[in-house]
Structure formats: C-alpha cells, structure tokens
Design a protein with these regions (language model features):
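Active-site loops and adjacent core secondary-structure elements that bind or stabilize anionic groups
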Residues: 214
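Conserved catalytic-core helix/loop/strand module for nucleotide-ribose chemistry
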Residues: 1-209
Length: 214
C-alpha cells in the first residue's frame, strides 16, 4: 500500500514541477514498461503469461524441471518478476528467436496520446532526457511525428560515452539497448548496470531530477 504521507495529488505534483522549472531545475523522465501499454505493447507480466502458456504446451513437467535446473531458473509462476526466467525457458536454446518475437510484437506499435506532451517537453524545454529500460521506439517516433527535433538515441551501452548533457536536443538513453541492438532480456544480463552506464547516470542525476513514468 502507498504511504499516503508521501503521495502527491496530480495538481500538487504539476505545480511543484512548474515551479521547479521556473527555478532552473531540470527534469528527466524514467520510462518503464507501463508507459508503453496504452500504445498496444504488452506489459512484462502479459508477456510472461503468454510465454508460460507456450512452455506448458511444449514441454512435459519433467522437461521443465530439468530445464529450470540447467538454466538456473527460479521463478516460473507468470508475473512481471518472472519475466526474465520465463524468457530464458521459452526461447532456449536460440535466443535470437526471442529477439525476433519482440521485433514482431513491437514493430506495429504507435505512440499513444500521452506521448505528445512528453515529446513537446523533450523538444521545447531543458527537460530533454529520457532514461528507459524499454526496447521500443515510441519516444523517438513521437518526436518525429509531433516535433521537428531529431533525438540522440543511445541504443547500446558502447554509445553512452557520446551523451552530451549540454545539448538542447532530446536524448533517449536505452539501458537495456534498443530493439535492433540485441536487447538485454536474460536475468544474468540485467543483474546490474554496465560500467559504461554508471558514470553517465551519476552525471545525469546530478543535473536532472528524475520523474518516473510507468
């Protein structure tokens, strides 16, 4: 349950953001999977449920038990927390099939209405940074559709060094990589931040106040 003493009404939150911006504070936006749902992209929990059904159809109980032991899988009850374990089971042994599945799932998604104000903020204010674990291209698509600003998209940790926080151009930092850059989808890949991201994020949070969306 949310701590009511730490929960803000929408009006209080927006007023605080507006006043902070007038006082030269910069905000960045941290996007999770929930931000993509209204654009037709399944949540992590919805994908986990789909993969769980596929696994039950493909394997016997004994085979699932053996695979869990081989892959070090701990969670198989479908939930957002089991996303990475169920991905590992569903697409073993060829995880390129997992990448192809995600491409098919995400490629037709279009930015929902909520991406319009986000694109406007990124393009027209100093609040120009998005940090996300999502693979999709909804933020950059919204910028192309609604604004004339081309974003700097960091779709791989090896490109993180090219982020320039002094630019007025929108920056999209994809911590788990972009859809076409072998996205990180297994538990051992996301157990911690890569070294390339750590220094960049420290600097980002010195300059920006994070606002979490989805």
């Amino acid at each position: 349950m949310l701590d009511e003493g730490r929960t803000l009404s929408l009006n209080v939150f927006l007023n605080a953001l507006e006043e902070g911006y007038r006082n030269e504070r910069r905000y960045c936006f941290i996007l999770g999977a929930g931000a993509s749902k209204t654009s037709g992209i399944p949540t992590g929990e919805e994908l986990a449920r789909q993969w769980y059904g596929d696994i039950l159809e493909r394997y016997s109980r004994e085979e699932i038990k053996a695979l869990k032991k081989r892959l070090g899988v701990r969670r198989t009850q479908p939930s957002s927390r089991a996303y990475f374990d169920l991905y590992a089971l569903r697409f073993f042994p060829d995880y390129q099939n997992g990448s192809a599945f995600l491409e098919r799932t995400l490629e037709r998604a279009q930015p929902s209405l909520g991406y319009y104000p986000l694109a406007s903020l990124l393009a027209n204010t100093r609040n120009n940074l998005v940090i996300t674990t999502n693979f999709d291209s909804l933020v950059e698509d919204a910028l192309f559709i609604y604004t004339d600003k081309k974003p700097i998209v960091i779709s791989h940790e090896l490109l993180a060094q090219y982020i320039n926080f002094n630019t007025s151009r929108p920056i999209i930092a994809k911590l788990h990589r972009g859809l076409f850059f072998d996205p990180l989808n297994r538990a051992e890949q996301v157990s911690g931040l890569s070294e390339q991201w750590k220094d960049i994020l420290r600097e980002a949070f010195r300059r920006y106040t994070p606002v979490v969306v989805g």
